[in-house]
């Protein structure tokens, strides 16, 4: 998560400053950084620090949260307030009055909605240069 913040900030710096030679490794700062994390790991402090930094710095990022309702063998109710990281993070939600993070939620088994949601997330991050969280729920564990 901390690397995600650094890479997103680099894109913002390239966009806001005319850096000689940056055209060799930047498209005028219009890159977005993609990161991924499991729902159980969102209970760790570094996740909240990274999300807050993304919101404060307004960096172009898409953060994917894969949620299978469990953290190893513990249900969400035992490690996440409100049993939903989207609900926990709702205070970060961007509004017309203040900057923040766009939070999208989609079911992992709904392929068409996944395509639509990710297309929308990419557009928001790239065009408006703000962070987006995509909370993918109702996933199954690989071994059952």
Regions found by a protein language model. Name each.
Residues 2-144:
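Glycine-rich ThDP/TPP pyrophosphate-binding loop and its adjacent helix/strand module
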